[in-house]
Design a protein with these regions (language model features):
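Glycine- and aromatic-enriched membrane alpha-helices
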Residues: 1-173
Length: 173
C-alpha cells in the first residue's frame, strides 16, 4: 500500500516485500498478540520497513540484496518492541496495562509496558550484538576460501538484486 501511494501503482515486489515484512514483524509477537494486535503490527511493518529500505538504499548508499536488513532486521526489532505495548493482557503488558505475576516464592511482581519495553529493547540489542559478532567471525573464516566477499565492480554497478538473483528489487526515486 505504501509503494502504491508513493508510485501510483502497486508492484509485485512491493506486495511480496510487504508480506515478508509483515511476517518478519509479527514473528516475535506471534504468541503474545491477538488478531487486532497482529493487524496493527502488520500495518506498521509495511510502513516502517518500506522507509527502512529507502534509508538503507538512498541515504546510506548500501545495496542490501533483497533488502534483508531493512525488512527482516528492522521488522524483527519493530515486532519485538511492539509486544510491550500491544501484547494481550496477561503476557507482556498489553495495551499499556500492568501485568501481575506471582513468582514461585509467592511474591507478586507488577510489570508495566514501559518496563517491558526496556526488557524487549535489551533483548534486541543482545540479538543484534550476537548477529554482528557471529557474522564477522563467519566472514573471516570463509573469506579466504572464497577469495573475499566483494562482488565485481560490474556486478556492483548492475546491482546485487539483478546480478545475484536476476530480479530487480525496489527502484526508489
Amino acid at each position: 500500500i505504501v509503494e502504491w501511494r508513493k508510485t501510483g501503482k502497486p508492484g509485485l515486489v512491493g506486495i511480496v516485500t510487504g508480506t515478508i515484512a509483515g511476517l518478519a514483524t509479527i514473528t516475535p509477537a506471534s504468541g503474545s498478540v491477538g488478531p487486532l494486535g497482529a493487524i496493527i503490527i502488520g500495518a506498521s511493518a509495511g510502513l516502517v520497513c518500506y522507509y527502512a529500505c529507502s534509508i538503507v538504499k538512498e541515504a546510506m548508499g548500501i545495496d542490501d540484496s533483497l533488502d534483508v536488513a531493512a525488512v527482516h532486521g528492522v521488522g524483527g526489532v519493530l515486532g519485538t518492541l511492539m509486544v510491550a505495548f500491544i501484547g494481550v493482557e496477561g503476557t507482556f503488558g498489553g495495551l499499556g496495562l500492568s501485568v501481575k505475576n506471582t513468582l514461585d516464592d509467592g511474591t507478586e511482581v507488577i510489570y508495566t509496558s514501559g518496563e517491558q519495553f526496556v526488557v524487549q529493547a535489551q533483548g534486541c540489542l543482545a540479538a543484534i550484538a550476537l548477529s554482528v559478532v557471529a557474522t564477522y567471525l563467519i566472514v573471516k573464516i570463509i573469506s579466504p576460501f572464497l577469495g573475499g566477499i566483494r562482488v565485481s565492480e560490474e556486478e556492483e554497478t548492475k546491482g546485487l538484486d539483478q546480478s545475484g538473483h536476476g530480479e530487480n528489487g525496489y527502484t526508489l526515486n
